Structure formats: C-alpha cells, structure tokens
Amino acid sequence: MYAKLGQLFKYRGMIIMMKKLEYFKVVLILPGNVLITIPLIIFFLTKETYSYNLINLNSVLFYISLLFLIVGLWLAIWSVRTFYNHGGDGTPGPWKPVSKLIIAGPYCYMRNPMLMGVFFLLLFESILFSSMPIFCWFLIFFIGNIFYFKNFEEKDLIKRFGEDYTNYRDKVSMFIPSLTPYNK
C-alpha cells in the first residue's frame, strides 16, 4: 500500500514539475523576448544613432519608471500565478491554451492583466534608459496586440467559451482595470 502511495506522490510530483517547466517555457519565450531579446537587438542596432543614458536616479522620471516596474512585475506575477492555479493543464502560451475561462485574481478586473504588466515593464525600460527606440517598440507591441486580440484571440475565445466569454468581454475592459471585480 505504501509503495503505491509513494508511486502516486512521485507521479503527482512529476506532473507538477512538468507544469512548472511549461510555465517557465512560456515566460522565457513570450515576455523574455519582448522585454529582453528585442530591446537588446534594438539597442545594438541603434546605439550609434541614439544615445542611451540611465536617467538621473534623483529625478521624478526615475520614480515614475520604478512605479511602472513595480506595477508591471506585480501584475505579471499575479497573472501567471492565477493562470497556474486556475488554468488546469493549459498555460498562458497559445500552444497549450486553458480549457476553462479564467475569471479570478486580476482577471476579475481586466481581461489582459499579464499583457498589461508587460506593457508597464516596457515603459519602465524606455524611461529608465531614455530610449525613444524602445518606446517605439512599446507602441508597436501595444498596437499589434490590440489588433491581434480584437481580430484573432477574441474570436477564438468566443468559439471556445461562448456566451461566458462574451458576457465577460462586455463587462470587463481589455486593459483598464475596473474598481469592482467581475461577477458572473
């Protein structure tokens, strides 16, 4: 009996480890490229044309950038944890979508809190390094995601979750948080 129980715990531990690995892959591929790889490429391609200077650490802009950093990290971490705890076998990555609509945690207040966190982190980078090219990358990424969500992801979510998603979409903003949580 104890051997079977040990096997069960070992199997469950392997499943949890595989799920954590899937989430690590999602974080590494999606936000990792948006926040690190692409800004580094932009930096190396534009370093001769633009000067990159850290902003004065005593300036108001520095504290504004810190606010973007804190809120961005908080939203991103809270969103990923909520996905992890409520997403079943799915992940935030499009290659393994969740099987049920997540309306918990930050998703009660806005439909795309994880992406909003990434937007804030890109703004943090562009302000901290006084970088117009990285700010332009933020604008391209922001507009591209709005286009993608409106024209592709929302259609898929309506197909997968039907009226539950349309009710949620009609009552919860894409990026601007509401003051009260969404209730079904």
Where do the model's predicted regions map?
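Membrane-anchoring alpha-helices and their flanking helix-loop junctions
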Residues: 1-104, 116-184
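Solvent-exposed interhelical
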Residues: 107
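Extended, alpha-helix-rich binding/interface surfaces that flank or overlap catalytic cores
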Residues: 112
